[in-house]
A protein has these predicted regions:
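Short, conserved beta-strand element in jelly-roll/cupin
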Residues: 47-49, 57-74, 109
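Short strand-coil-strand connectors
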Residues: 39, 74-78, 101
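A short, N-terminal "cap"/entry segment at the start of jelly-roll beta-barrel domains
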Residues: 1-44
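A cytosolic small-molecule/anion-sensing beta-strand core signal
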Residues: 39, 67-68, 83-84, 102, ...
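Short acidic-glycine-tyrosine-enriched beta hairpin
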Residues: 76-92
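Ligand-binding loop in jelly-roll beta-barrel domains
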Residues: 92-119
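Conserved short histidine dyad/triad with adjacent acidic residue
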Residues: 28-29, 42-58
Length: 119
């Protein structure tokens, strides 16, 4: 599966961010876009259906918050299932894979400079 990962910051400070509209307009199966920078972190929007590869981030924690759909995070020995209005933080150095068995919209918070595909 092809991943569409946009790391450019789409919105400036004091600009309205309509994440719902962006998600509704998305036609890709695995897409994410950096929405804005907040201090030393990035807020990213993802629209996912399918699965990502196993990877880790050596220097950055990663936070996922499900807006709609169902999101699975595979860790060593267990899988965490997230439903709307639920979040989960994967600490740096932890190997993980994300999956979405249906179209799912997720907000992510990551350190600026993160490599979304892993180190």
């Amino acid at each position: 599966m092809d991943y569409v990962i946009r790391t450019d910051v789409k919105f400036s400070p004091l600009e309205l961010i309509d994440a719902g509209q962006l998600a509704d307009e998305c036609t890709e199966r695995w897409w994410n876009q950096t929405l804005c920078r907040v201090n030393d972190s990035l807020v990213r929007l993802g629209v996912f259906e399918g699965e990502f590869h196993f990877h880790k981030h050596d220097r950055e924690d990663e936070f996922f918050y499900v807006v709609e759909g169902r999101f699975l995070i595979d860790l060593e020995g267990r899988t965490v299932e997230l439903l709307p209005k639920q979040g989960f933080m994967v600490p740096k150095g932890v190997v993980h894979r994300t999956r979405a068995p249906e179209r799912t919209v997720v907000l992510m918070v990551e350190a600026a400079g993160v490599i979304p595909t892993g180190d």
